[in-house]
Amino acid sequence: MKVLITGGTGFIGSALTRSLTEQGFDVTVLSRYPDAVEKICGPGVNALNNLNQLKPEDTYQVIINLAGAPIFDAHWSDARKQVIRDSRISLTKKLVACMARMTVKPELLISGSAIGYYGDQGDVVLTEQSVTRADF
């Protein structure tokens, strides 16, 4: 199975990429640092540095979108929150546009984001329909 991961060299993405390749998946990582993909994610991972490298005839059964500005490296000022938000929204829109041009559409798109959007709600199970909080 072919899997495309955006943000595959990040905190979550690198662990996921290693796990998937160990299970035999054919993984391609979109990263700002394509030369570092093998070092960070392990051998056998394909690397792209731009969505424009995706061709309409490329086929991926699964696309996992984890890309975005890091959340651990700076205080969350209003300006930083805007960077975090914009980096995720912009890339997601571009990714969906690329998917629309694909001859064979992926069977599954998984798009991750920070749980901070929902705030700390204890042991409550959170879904897309959950009420957001002003924590972020």
How would you describe each model-predicted region?
Residues 6, 60-66, 110-112:
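Rossmann-fold scaffold of SDR-type NAD(P)-dependent oxidoreductases
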Residues 3-23:
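N-terminal Rossmann NAD(P)H-binding glycine-rich loop of SDR-like oxidoreductase domains
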Residues 18-20, 42-44, 77-80, 123-127:
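Short, glycine/charged-enriched secondary-structure capping and boundary segments
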Residues 36, 41-94:
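NAD(P)H-binding glycine-rich loop region in Rossmannoid oxidoreductase-like domains
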Residues 15-16, 39, 74-75, 119-122:
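Short glycine-/acidic-enriched loop or helix-start segments at secondary-structure transitions
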Residues 30-34:
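N-terminal Rossmann-fold cofactor-binding loop
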Residues 93-135:
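Conserved Rossmann-fold NAD(P)-dependent oxidoreductase catalytic core, especially the SDR/UDP-sugar
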Residues 27:
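Short beta-strand element of Class I
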